[in-house]
Amino acid sequence: TQFVNELSNNHASDLIYYLTNNFFFPYSNCDVKYFSSGDDFFPHMIEAIQSAKKFIFLEYFIIEPDSSWNEIFNALKKKVQEGVEVRILCDGLGSPVLSTSYYQNYLKANGFKSRVFIPIVPVFSTHLNNRDHRKILIVDGQLAFTGGLNLSNEYFNRGKENRFAYWKDNAVQIQGQAVHTFLQLFLQSWNLFAKDIEDFTPYLPSSYGIYDKPGITIPYGDDFFNNKDIAEDIYLYIINNAKKYLNITSPYILVDNHLQEDLIFAAARGVKVSIIVPAIPDHLITFCIGKTFLDT
């Protein structure tokens, strides 16, 4: 309520009110750092893993067993040997190798706790289209990373020559009270198909550092099994309230009629709309569909 009152003349207050009603709360005691590329982000991620004292949680759509993952895995394995709890949650479609029973058993044999989010077997599962596209790394409940970077060489511009040229994506590091929401999101995903629901309490820090930074942080995430499209609602609100410009970067442009009409209307009322997409596609069909929209 205090945050909403302080921002009563700002569109941010509407978003805060909406998110709070969906149980995603604003935090002021936070520090946020932006990484403009995967190659900038990677060493910070390794450093954060190496700093862990209690636990490390990873939730990723794509984890590819390549040289980048080997470096991450070795850093995680060393922490396990030091007594740090490591949990890995990967998507059954996005991480086909890690999702195999062989690799899951390999992780568990090395002391990891690991689960697969909706395996693609059976193929005709009613949940097949519910995928976990999150990219979250949490260390000790005090620090979290999120953004567009999966765990694969191409995202970090590492390994052999990248067939997609330079991969441009980004990530953010969050420290402070907002990490609470990332813990909540991860543990809810972890417990989705569990027989016994765990108590979250032991993973919640008793205190956080003091971060004298301006602004507020509101992490949020869509629920996998309800009809609320929180992220879409927020994007539509931002588009429809833009006054000067809209800068959009995305690996894929797959928009429905509603979003397309809102973007066209924004441009028609004088908003400068700029959209940046990759020149070299990693999924040709998706690229062609997106190009059809951009050519309209």
Model feature map: region roles:
Residues 1-233, 237, 241, 265, ...:
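N-terminal localization/anchoring segments of enzymes in phospholipid and broader phosphate metabolism
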Residues 149, 251-252:
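Active-site metal-binding loops of divalent metal-dependent hydrolases
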Residues 154-159, 259-260, 286:
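A short, polar/proline- and glycine-enriched secondary-structure boundary/capping micro-motif
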Residues 169, 249-250:
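A short, conserved beta-strand element enriched in hydrophobic/aromatic residues
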Residues 252-274, 278-283:
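Helical hairpin unit composed of two closely spaced alpha helices linked by a short loop
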Residues 288-296:
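Acidic, Ser/Thr-rich peripheral helices and adjacent loops at domain boundaries
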